Amino acid sequence: MLQNLCRALAFGSALFAATASFAEDRPDQIVIRYAPVTEPQLQPIAEYVKKAHALEKAQILLKPLRLPRPLKIEMRGCQGEINSWYEDDVVTICYEFLDDIWKNAPRETTPAGVAPIDAVIGPYVDVVFHEVGHAIFDYLAIPLFGREEDAADEISVYLTLKFPKADAHRLILGNAYQYRSDLVGHKLPLSLEKFANEHELGAQRFFNVLCLAYGYDPKLFGDVLKKGYLPAERADDCEDEYKQLNYAFDKLIRPHIDQQLAKQIYEAAWLPPTTMRPPRRLGRHSRPASAK
């Protein structure tokens, strides 16, 4: 009898703690900051992203996320390092990283149908969602199997696929283009450091992005299979890969998202027309290692 009472009290305490934790979480916890630029070569890109309200748009997209405390997203110069990372409740995106995205965007629409503007916005959305994915794992104590970097990649793809279908297709292809550019930019044979890195190789991330997208909607992303960008052997398993991701998201993260707010935000069309052209060469930086 006493043992059963103790069990009931323990269960009640755990339930109360979990309920209290959820009650403390709330949406609209994203804080943004454009850090002042001291490097003259970064001034053009810093001015451009601020004028485009890049962080304000990210703030809106992440507004439905229920967090226990504020999360800051900051853009700043990184002394020439092309990188992004999450640490101590702050997502940092280097202006050098954004400049590199612009530098590697194609001048014309590619044979795969990637417009220049999509090759800019796609990777930007990806890096925001990827680094915020790291923050989600930290803030919400999300249990992970495997590498955290892979899980952050998957969170980014998952959230991108929640845009309206036309926008999602453009963003996914734009993101994949950047990973393909990483592969093209590497010299072969690859160094051991590339294989030992916490990130997968650009080529692997390229196929992972396309696979999850194809698994989500084979009709919408059927072109990546028809054009040979996604091998048929991999495509056979993509639906199951997406189902696994969707199941994990439903169990672990969806309870921390304001569904009504998310529906309002993600049903809107976000992207400019494909005819819009990004500015060419806003700064001068060489190709770096992958972002964190």
Question: Model regions: which residues?
Answer:
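Bacterial N-terminal signal peptides that target proteins for export
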Residues: M1-L9
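Catalytic zinc-binding patch centered on the HExxH motif and its immediate surroundings
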Residues: M75-R107
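Short alpha-helix carrying the canonical HExxH Zn2+-binding catalytic motif
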Residues: I117-I136
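An active-site-proximal "capping" alpha-helix that borders the catalytic cofactor pocket
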Residues: F145-P164
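Zn2+-dependent metallopeptidase catalytic core
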Residues: I45-P70
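Acidic/histidine-rich, surface-exposed loop or edge segments in extracytoplasmic proteins
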Residues: D25-A46, I136-D138
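Pan-zinc metallopeptidase signature
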Residues: E24-V31, E39, S191-K292
